[in-house]
């Protein structure tokens, strides 16, 4: 493995950032420098940091797609999970000690069930709106799969391992479950309905569970009907108990322009009074959508929720909560009407100490025997898609694409991670080993509208090809914007064909979802290729970035598939 300047940076040495296409230096947009001395040292992103280092934070605390977040607490430790739909592994598990700085520590699901059903991409299906709880030294996560029912996994360590998913309640359209262990030992579950599968929506129900919270034993009881209370599209239920009241937190009004309501009752089955407690108001924080209430050891209450930011997905916000007359008031309630507005900057939670700044990892040197936790596949993975190597690279074996292939939407072996914010550069070093079969390895920014730059073999030459696709889920054909053969070039002082060396693929991601790709043969001079393209969100998720290695079906090409070696992937 060639330890050039970028590799040293991948070892978490100081990075200085610039968005210039023709040089490889970097600086954090927040003015903070990234320093990472090893795997046990806090990783700090060079592109987005919420903690301002002065006792305050800015929202979003994670400017990445953590949809439908939920949080549980164990002492001074907080654990968060979020919707992952059909990304595998799924159910990301993040840890924090101050609710602002978060580290990705594992996943709750390593394989989606039914296994064969999710062996191919099922965009927008899978894991919806999980609920994480800690009870009697066990961690529980419940979620709804709108096509199969409500599942759960358990663990004694939130970093894993977690049990295999077990079906708690079968049915179509059952979503957004939340579990409550009551003071008398009884267990209850609330959930909502997906109208696309069940034919009903905007309502929340509660039913009693068995003592192990493994299956329901009581009838569904309607507790909130948003259809008659002006809270259409009510969903995302979270069930709590505080000071003798039962509370159901839920968003209504839709993801983009909705609000937060809270229903409360002295009795588990109601009747429930309903109140709006958080709305956009005159801020630029649209939505404020579903999330989780948590209380620190110091007695402070906080609400973590998401904001829909289109191509970035559903980013994570943190708002203070004040309890007034038994009702939570979220954010800042300037006019005293009981409904707050979300904050942009605020004093950090009182957790009794000051902790290091930390963010989820983005870059990867592929020096570990396991994939970095930031990566996930587009479907249940198959053996042979990827192998870490003792030589310090990731080997991606080409997967034959479908005979009906027109774009990447239904390719299962896309290795992707979340877009970390709306301005950054991602660069990767790849080598392609082809067996004459038009294999290709690519860097992609993926969504319903996507763009990619690939290195491929065709007609005895290696080519760089820049493509984009609009409305990929509709089966639209890719458009080729540039196709460039790689030839020996004295400018790079490479005596042989460039594909025998590493080829460096780069994308500069800009506000508005704009992408400019470039390439280099020496990792010093980068040349733009193709055109600036606009990408969009996927099905219920933001755009993602990552890698792929594919080949035409053998029945078409008559050739054996090849492979690619990925040396590193740097985000700055």
What are these regions, as identified by a protein language model?
Residues 3-9:
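Short, Lys/Arg-enriched N-terminal segments with co-localized hydrophobic residues
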Residues 9-16:
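Sec-dependent signal peptide recognition
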Residues 22-24:
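C-terminal motif of bacterial Sec signal peptides marking the signal peptidase cleavage site
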Residues 26-572:
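Carbohydrate-active catalytic/glycan-binding domains of CAZyme proteins
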């Amino acid at each position: 493995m060639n330890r050039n300047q970028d590799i040293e940076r991948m070892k978490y040495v100081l990075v200085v950032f610039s968005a210039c296409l023709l040089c490889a230096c970097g600086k954090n947009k927040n003015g903070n420098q990234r320093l990472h001395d090893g795997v046990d040292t806090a990783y700090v992103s060079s592109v987005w940091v919420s903690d301002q280092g002065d006792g305050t934070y800015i929202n979003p605390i994670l400017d990445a797609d953590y949809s439908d977040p939920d949080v549980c607490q164990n002492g001074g430790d907080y654990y968060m999970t979020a919707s992952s739909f059909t990304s595998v592994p799924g159910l990301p598990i993040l840890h924090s000690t101050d609710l602002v700085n978060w580290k990705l520590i594992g996943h709750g699901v390593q394989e989606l069930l039914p296994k064969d059903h999710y062996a191919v991409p099922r965009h927008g299906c899978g894991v919806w709106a999980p609920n994480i709880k800690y009870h009697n030294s066990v961690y529980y996560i419940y979620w709804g799969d709108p096509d199969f029912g409500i599942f759960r996994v358990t663990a004694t360590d939130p970093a894993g391992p977690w049990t295999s998913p077990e079906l708690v309640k079968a049915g179509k359209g059952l979503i957004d479950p939340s579990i409550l262990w009551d003071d008398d030992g009884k267990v209850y579950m609330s959930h909502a309905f997906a109208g696309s599968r069940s034919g009903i929506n905007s309502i929340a129900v509660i039913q009693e569970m068995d003592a192990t919270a493994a299956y329901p034993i009581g009838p569904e009881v309607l507790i909130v009907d948003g259809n008659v209370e002006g809270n259409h599209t009510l969903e995302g239920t979270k069930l709590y108990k505080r000071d003798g009241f039962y509370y159901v937190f839920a968003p209504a009004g839709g993801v983009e322009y909705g609000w937060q309501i809270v229903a409360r009752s002295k009795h588990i089955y109601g009747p429930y009074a309903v109140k709006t407690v958080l709305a956009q108001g005159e801020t630029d924080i649209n939505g404020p959508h579903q999330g989780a209430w948590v209380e620190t050891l110091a007695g402070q209450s906080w609400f973590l929720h998401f904001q829909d930011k289109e191509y970035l997905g559903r980013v994570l916000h943190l708002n203070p909560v004040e309890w007034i007359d038994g009702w939570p008031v979220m954010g800042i309630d300037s006019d005293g009407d009981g409904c707050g507005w979300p904050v942009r900057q605020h004093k950090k939670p009182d957790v009794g100490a000051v902790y290091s700044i930390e963010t989820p990892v983005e870059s990867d040197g592929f020096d570990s025997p396991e994939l970095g936790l930031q990566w996930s596949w587009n479907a249940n993975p198959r053996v042979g898609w990827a192998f870490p190597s003792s030589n310090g690279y990731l080997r991606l074996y080409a997967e034959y694409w479908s005979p009906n292939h027109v774009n990447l939407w239904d390719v299962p072996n896309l290795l992707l991670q979340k877009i970390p914010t709306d301005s950054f550069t991602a660069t990767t070093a790849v080598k392609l080993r082809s067996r004459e079969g038009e294999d290709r390895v690519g860097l992609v920014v993926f969504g319903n509208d996507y763009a990619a730059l690939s290195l491929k073999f065709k007609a005895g030459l290696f080519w760089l090809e820049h493509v984009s696709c609009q409305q990929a889920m509709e089966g639209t054909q890719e458009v080729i914007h540039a196709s460039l053969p790689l030839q020996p070039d004295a400018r790079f002082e490479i005596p042989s064909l460039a594909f025998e060396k590493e080829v460096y693929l780069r994308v500069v991601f800009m506000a508005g979802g704009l992408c400019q790709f470039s390439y280099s043969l020496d990792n010093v001079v980068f040349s733009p290729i193709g055109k600036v393209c606009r990408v969009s969100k996927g099905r219920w998720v933001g755009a993602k970035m990552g890698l792929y290695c594919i080949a035409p079906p053998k029945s078409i090409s008559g050739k054996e598939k090849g492979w690619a070696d990925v040396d590193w992937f740097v985000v700055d």
